[in-house]
Amino acid sequence: MGSQSSKAPRGDVTAEEAAGASPAKANGQENGHVKSNGDLTPKGEGESPPVNGTDEAAGATGDAIEPAPPSQGAEAKGDAPPKETPKKKKKFSFKKPFKLSGLSFKRNRKEGGGDSSASSPTEEEQEQGEIGACSEEGTAPEGKAAATPESQEPQAKGAEAGAACKGGDTEEEAGPPAEPSTPSGPESGPTPAGAEQNE
């Protein structure tokens, strides 16, 4: 829709005369745009685009140079997929050593709440869980046994559990811890267990 004032509606009347004659266009606007005649200089003289457009072409080449960083960004995007694959590998490698080494039975339960490996742990994980339980059982009752001489049976059980965890014979491991913690020296390992049963 071209401006109606640019068309000469009657004979020799030009757009400038029509704009000057109209009271609505007295502010120098023509169809919503400010008219500029030779007396008025544009606000941004240095930033005004040239009429012939030669500098715009140079600016376009400058713009063509500027897309080079986005092409570097494309290379960065090319680098991004290898970065994504290590992330996938990290997830895979994190789970895989977890299953093989069985680092912590408790941690496996926390982490794999919905995972099938948590509901049915492997043999190694079960062994690790037993060892963890044995070490907890072995340390707590032994500490109590050292404090009170009456709890010698739990100490023996703790020593046996510790021996079972270490894979050694229960008799060898149970004997030495029971002897130093007993108040009376002549008592042997099996005798304190029988004494507690009588109590």
From Swiss-Prot:
The keyword Phosphoprotein applies. Residues 76-85 have a biased composition (Basic and acidic residues). The modification Phosphoserine is found at residues 22, 36, 48, 71, 93, 101, 104, 119-120, 135, 151. It comes from the Eukaryota. Its main location: cytoplasm. Keywords: Actin-binding, Calmodulin-binding, Cell membrane, Cytoplasm, Cytoskeleton, Lipoprotein, Membrane, Myristate, Phosphoprotein. Residues 86-98 have a biased composition (Basic residues). It is a lipid-anchor. GO terms for cellular component: cytoplasm; cytoskeleton; plasma membrane. It is found in: Cytoplasm, Cytoskeleton; Cell membrane. A lipid is attached at residue 2 (N-myristoyl glycine). The modification Phosphothreonine is found at residues 14, 85, 148, 170, 182, 191. Residues 1-199 are annotated as: Disordered. Residues 16-26, 53-64, 156-167, 181-199 have a biased composition (Low complexity). Phosphorylated. Phosphorylation at Ser-120 and Thr-182 is non-redundantly catalyzed by MAPK8 in vivo. Phosphorylation at Thr-148 is preferentially catalyzed by MAPK8 in vivo, but this modification can also be catalyzed by other kinases in the absence of MAPK8. May be phosphorylated by protein kinase C, which disrupts the interaction with calmodulin. Transmembrane segments: none annotated. GO terms for molecular function: actin filament binding; calmodulin binding. InterPro entries: MARCKS (IPR002101). Controls cell movement by regulating actin cytoskeleton homeostasis and filopodium and lamellipodium formation. When unphosphorylated, induces cell migration. When phosphorylated by MAPK8, induces actin bundles formation and stabilization, thereby reducing actin plasticity, hence restricting cell movement, including neuronal migration. May be involved in coupling the protein kinase C and calmodulin signal transduction systems. Binds to filamentous actin (F-actin), but not to monomeric G-actin, independently of its phosphorylation status. Interacts with calmodulin. This is MARCKS-related protein. It comes from Oryctolagus cuniculus. The lineage of its organism: Eukaryota, Metazoa, Chordata, Craniata, Vertebrata.
